[in-house]
Design a protein with these regions (language model features):
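Non-core capping and flanking segments associated with repeat-based/extracellular domains
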Residues: 1-340
Length: 340
């Protein structure tokens, strides 16, 4: 059965819901995220819940008025709510019936659905609210994180934007486009605390993700990035001064190519035995994007650096206009043994 059918059957009774939870244990173990909102990627590990945020609500309400007879009622977490079967999308079906609600009920509807699913899948699943709108309050719900997409260049009120970021419960992903702006964010901005960040920006200083990032994975695209900034990034990781949680960093430059050996020598890289195949660094992405790849691009490099504070190793690769940096959960001795 499709997930949509399983959910519909689960509303028949409490006993039916219990039976589904028991009979689908193996299937539910493969699910690692529940996404509220737009998620057009082919990802079998995700359950996608149709939930329009404020930027799409007017269109959503209009569609609801035009299709009155298609709606039916379900009891969700003790609340009677109107639903309809979701339209067949171009890429995939949604996995849950589409709720009907007014703008004023948005928070209570999300709360009811979230608690229903939390009881269904448990707290080991990652619950993500996906939105590209920053001027409304995100409800604080247990185990709910937020994924935000925006264009920093068109934001006029930076204080409101910072207030929105600080009011969000947990920032899972930030995806942003920055062009032709000198708007600065505070070094303490919650933007830099997102677990996953993907940026396209002209200048690496606006915002200064390369300097202030505190999350796990970053994919940064700059028009130009000076060699000294790449060197400073690696040295600050080596010293333990910054990037303590970092797992993976990809830095791509469109207008310049860093001199490979000069940068590697400047950061004090070490080299594995050139006669042996170096270990391959790759790990599961925090968030799957349009390329639909569940894992980071492999780093196969003889060059590596060691963090002074805990002897942790990171593979470093510079190829053409890219720097790739992958942190291993291994000490230097453990890392070198991988080649044996």
């Amino acid at each position: 059965m499709e997930m949509l059918d399983i959910f519909l059957v689960s509303f028949l009774s409490k006993n039916m819901k219990k039976m589904i939870k028991l009979s689908q244990i193996s299937r539910f173990k493969t699910i690692n995220r529940v996404v509220y909102g737009y998620y057009p990627f082919q990802d079998n590990r995700a359950v996608v819940i149709p939930f329009p945020m404020a930027e799409h609500l007017e269109e959503f309400i209009k569609r609801r008025k035009e299709a009155k007879n298609e709606y039916f009622q379900l009891n969700v977490s003790g609340n009677e709510m109107d639903f309809r079967l979701p339209d067949k999308g171009k890429y995939r079906l949604y996995d849950f019936p589409e709720a009907s609600f007014d703008k004023s009920d948005q928070e209570s509807v999300l709360k009811s659905i979230h608690y229903y699913l939390l009881d269904f899948f448990g707290d080991s699943v990652d619950y993500q609210l996906s939105t590209n709108y920053y001027a409304h309050l995100i409800p604080k719900l247990p185990h709910l994180s937020v994924c935000v997409t925006f264009n920093l260049s068109v934001l006029h009120d930076m204080k409101s934007f910072e207030d929105f970021l600080s009011s969000t419960p947990v920032l899972k992903r930030i995806q942003m486009h920055v062009c032709g702006t000198k708007k600065r964010l505070s070094p303490e901005s919650k933007l830099y605390q997102a677990e996953y960040i993907r940026t396209i920006q002209h200048d690496p200083h606006f915002p200064a993700v390369l300097r202030h990032f505190q999350g796990r994975q970053a994919f940064l695209s700059f028009a130009k990035c000076e060699d000294l900034e790449l060197i400073e990034f690696v040295k600050r990781w080596k010293s333990g001064e910054a990037f303590q949680k970092l797992e993976y960093m990809k830095i791509k430059m469109t207008d310049n190519k860093p001199p490979r050996y000069e940068v590697l020598n400047a950061v004090g890289v070490k080299y594995t035995d050139k006669t042996k195949q170096p270990p391959t660094h790759t790990l599961a992405k925090v968030f799957i994007t349009g390329d639909c790849k569940p894992y980071t691009d492999p780093i196969i490099s003889h060059s590596y650096v060691v963090r002074e504070s805990d002897n942790r190793v990171a593979s470093v690769s510079i190829h053409r206009n890219e720097l790739n940096f992958g942190v291993w959960n291994k000490t230097e001795d453990e890392f070198l043994k991988l080649m044996d």
